[in-house]
């Protein structure tokens, strides 16, 4: 029997209708796997070993009573076959410390999804720079002069922090916006932090598409997150509306270009954000939208694809 651990935000406060981590747990349990639950505060390192307080977990599709805990254990993480790192951003120093603890388990044979080193290496905003032919024109800088010049070149730009999620602190700045200076000051904290600028993509009105890639294989359906009236952000957390649809030709092209590199880096479950035919983000920490896509296209099991990939990788380790 496969022992699966998960590191996540408190399961007591999730929305099971939309939570991707919960969908993963349901599928793992359906396969008879043993579930071990952890939060960030349960992880620790002793004598060079990653360890944790874990609780045995049962889950069920019941909006009033979706989980129960069993026995509590204190164990070395290498006792688990696989660990899903599903802690939501912020990607801060605490998150980085957790990846080092998980990496000690990986060094002793545990499969960690996603690979701890790659979680550190592949910043969700910056990793797109490795694929400049697929992205909008992009500037990363602390300098107000650089950002102003970029704004003059394009006239209509998006400014965002490098560590945000869910559409927080994303600004659209048009040609004669009187707030440009204060937005730059706010995002860069008076030129002390890097931020990202990209040319505005009018195709956002058709949706910001979340394309999932599982162990190098693009899922054939995506979730287009369509901005609310008067908004430029499609994120569901910012009031966007989700619409599942098949991948377009350009979605396939982008996903197939990026997928082999993701697989090679041990990034087994990844969410690409695509606007029109441009790649805007590569989400590696805790990608979502599985529930919405599976609800619209029941013939696809994304969590099934993931658990199959985990089984394959575990079999390869033993071979």
From Swiss-Prot:
UniProt pathway: Sulfur metabolism; glutathione biosynthesis; glutathione from L-cysteine and L-glutamate: step 2/2
Organism, scientific name: Yersinia pestis
Cofactor requirement: Mg(2+); Mn(2+)
This protein's record includes keyword Kinase: no
Name the record gives this protein: Glutathione synthetase
Cofactor note: Binds 1 Mg(2+) or Mn(2+) ion per subunit.
Residues binding Mg(2+), per UniProt: 281, 283
One GO cellular component term: cytoplasm
Residue span(s) of domain ATP-grasp: 125-311
């Amino acid at each position: 029997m496969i022992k699966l651990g998960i590191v996540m935000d408190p399961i007591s406060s999730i929305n099971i209708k939309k939570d991707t981590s919960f969908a993963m747990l349901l599928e793992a349990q359906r396969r008879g796997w043993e579930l071990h639950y952890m939060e960030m505060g349960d992880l620790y390192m002793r004598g060079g070993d990653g360890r944790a307080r874990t609780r045995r977990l049962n889950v069920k599709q019941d909006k009033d009573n979706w989980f129960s805990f069993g026995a509590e254990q204190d164990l070395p993480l290498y006792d688990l076959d696989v660990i899903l790192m599903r802690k939501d951003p912020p990607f801060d120093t605490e998150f980085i410390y957790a990846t080092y603890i998980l990496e000690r388990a990986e060094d002793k044979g545990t499969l960690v999804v996603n690979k701890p080193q790659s979680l550190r290496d592949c910043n969700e905003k910056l990793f797109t720079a490795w694929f400049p032919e697929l992205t909008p024109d992009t500037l990363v800088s602390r300098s107000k002069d650089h950002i102003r010049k970029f704004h003059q070149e394009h006239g209509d730009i998006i400014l965002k922090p490098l560590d945000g999620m869910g559409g927080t602190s994303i600004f659209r700045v048009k040609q004669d916006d009187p707030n440009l200076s204060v937005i730059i000051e706010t995002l860069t904290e008076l030129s002390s932090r890097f931020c990202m600028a990209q040319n505005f993509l009018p195709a956002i009105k058709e949706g910001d598409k979340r394309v999932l890639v599982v162990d190098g294989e693009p899922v054939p359906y995506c979730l287009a997150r369509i901005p609310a009236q008067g908004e430029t952000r499609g994120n569901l957390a910012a009031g966007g509306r989700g619409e599942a649809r098949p991948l377009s030709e350009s979605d396939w092209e982008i996903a197939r270009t990026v997928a082999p590199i993701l697989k090679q880096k041990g990034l087994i479950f990844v969410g690409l954000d695509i606007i029109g035919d441009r790649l805007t983000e590569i989400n590696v920490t805790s990608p979502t939208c599985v529930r919405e896509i599976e609800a619209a296209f029941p013939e696809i099991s994304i969590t099934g694809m993931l658990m199959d990939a985990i089984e394959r990788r575990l079999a390869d380790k033993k071979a």
